[in-house]
Amino acid sequence: MEPVPSARAELQFSLLANVSDTFPSAFPSASANASGSPGARSASSLALAIAITALYSAVCAVGLLGNVLVMFGIVRYTKLKTATNIYIFNLALADALATSTLPFQSAKYLMETWPFGELLCKAVLSIDYYNMFTSIFTLTMMSVDRYIAVCHPVKALDFRTPAKAKLINICIWVLASGVGVPIMVMAVTQPRDGAVVCTLQFPSPSWYWDTVTKICVFLFAFVVPILIITVCYGLMLLRLRSVRLLSGSKEKDRSLRRITRMVLVVVGAFVVCWAPIHIFVIVWTLVDINRRDPLVVAALHLCIALGYANSSLNPVLYAFLDENFKRCFRQLCRAPCGGQEPGSLRRPRQATARERVTACTPSDGPGGGAAA
C-alpha cells in the first residue's frame, strides 16, 4: 500500500470530503509558505473557507433537523409506515448521516488540517460513500416501486408492502458496504506540508486504482441508476397518457399521480445536485486542467457543497409536495406545546399492508399524501 501521489490525491471522491487536503496549496500564495503553517493563508483562501463553513453550517442545521423529523414521523405515526415512506426513511437516514459530518469538514477547512484523528477520518470518508450509494440506490428502488404501482397495479398488491421495503433497504446498505467498508479500510491520516490530511491510501499502483475508483463511482453511483430511473419514468409516462383511470377510483388515481410526481421531483433534485460533482470529478481525472486556478478550486468546492445541499433539500420537498408529511410535521411541532389532538394521529383500526392515502389526518377524508 502506498499513499496516492500528490498529483492524483488532490481529488478523492468521498463526496470529495478529503479534497480539502489540497486546500492549503490550492492557491499559489498559500502554497508559497514553506513551513505549511496554517497561519500564512491568502485572503482568498480564508474567504473561501469562511464561505464554505457558513454554507455547511446552514446545510447541517436544516439537513439534520429535517431528516430527523422525517424519520421520527415515519417511526411514530402508523399511517406513515407505507412502502414509499419506508424508502424515504432510508433516504433520510443516509442524508442525516452525511450532514452530521459537516461540522468536522468545516473545521478542516478553517484550520487547514485534520485534527480529529484517524478513526473519525475513516468514519467521515466511509459515511460519504455510504450516503452516495445508498441515496441513489434508494431513489432507483423508489422509481421501480412507482413503476410497479403505475404499470402493474395487480402485482403491486404483493410487492409493495412495508415489510418488503424494509428488506430491500437492508439489501441496499449491504450492497453499499461493498464500497463503504473498503473506503473505511483505506482511509488514513498523513502529514503533508506541515499539516495533517485525511485521505485514501490505495494499493499500488495508486494512480491506477484512484482513477478506476472514480470511473466506477461515476458509472455505478450515477450513470447506470439514472438510466434505470429514466426507463421507469418513461414507461410510467406512456402508461399515464394511455389510461385515464389506473385504479378505477379518481381519488386513488390523484394520490398515485401525486406521489409519482413527488418521487420524480426528489430524483430530479438529486440529479441536479449531484451531476456537477460527478462530471467535475471525471474532468478533473481525465483532463489536464490547472488545479491551482482559484476559479477551478472555487467551482470544485461549490459542486461539493451542492452535493451536500441535496441532503437538506429532501425534507423540504417532502413538506411542500406531500400533504401527509406536512400535517405530521405540524403535529410534531405542536405536540411539545400540547396542541396535538388526542388520537388524531393514531387510529384504532388495523393498518393494511398496502399504502393508503391518509396519514396524520383528523378525519377519514382524503389526505392526498405519500401513501399511494
From Swiss-Prot:
Which GO molecular function annotations are given, in alphabetical order? G protein-coupled enkephalin receptor activity; G protein-coupled opioid receptor activity; neuropeptide binding; receptor serine/threonine kinase binding
A single Gene Ontology CC annotation of this entry is: postsynaptic membrane
Where in the cell does this protein reside? Cell membrane
Q: Which residues lie on this side of the membrane: Cytoplasmic?
A: 76-85, 145-163, 239-261, 322-372
Where are its TM segments located?
Answer: 48-75, 86-110, 123-144, 164-186, 207-238, 262-284, 300-321
Q: Which InterPro entries match?
A: Delta_opi_rcpt, GPCR_Rhodpsn, GPCR_Rhodpsn_7TM, Opioid_rcpt
Its principal location? membrane
> What SUPFAM superfamilies does this protein's entry cite?
Family A G protein-coupled receptor-like
* Cross-referenced PROSITE patterns: G_PROTEIN_RECEP_F1_1, G_PROTEIN_RECEP_F1_2
The entry's function note states: G-protein coupled receptor that functions as a receptor for endogenous enkephalins and for a subset of other opioids. Ligand binding causes a conformation change that triggers signaling via guanine nucleotide-binding proteins (G proteins) and modulates the activity of down-stream effectors, such as adenylate cyclase. Signaling leads to the inhibition of adenylate cyclase activity. Inhibits neurotransmitter release by reducing calcium ion currents and increasing potassium ion conductance. Plays a role in the perception of pain and in opiate-mediated analgesia.
How it assembles, according to the record, is: May form homooligomers. Forms a heterodimer with OPRM1. Interacts with GPRASP1. Interacts with RTP4; the interaction promotes cell surface localization of the OPRD1-OPRM1 heterodimer.
Q: What is this protein called?
A: Delta-type opioid receptor
Organism from which the protein derives: Rattus norvegicus
Q: Which gene name does the record give?
A: Oprd1
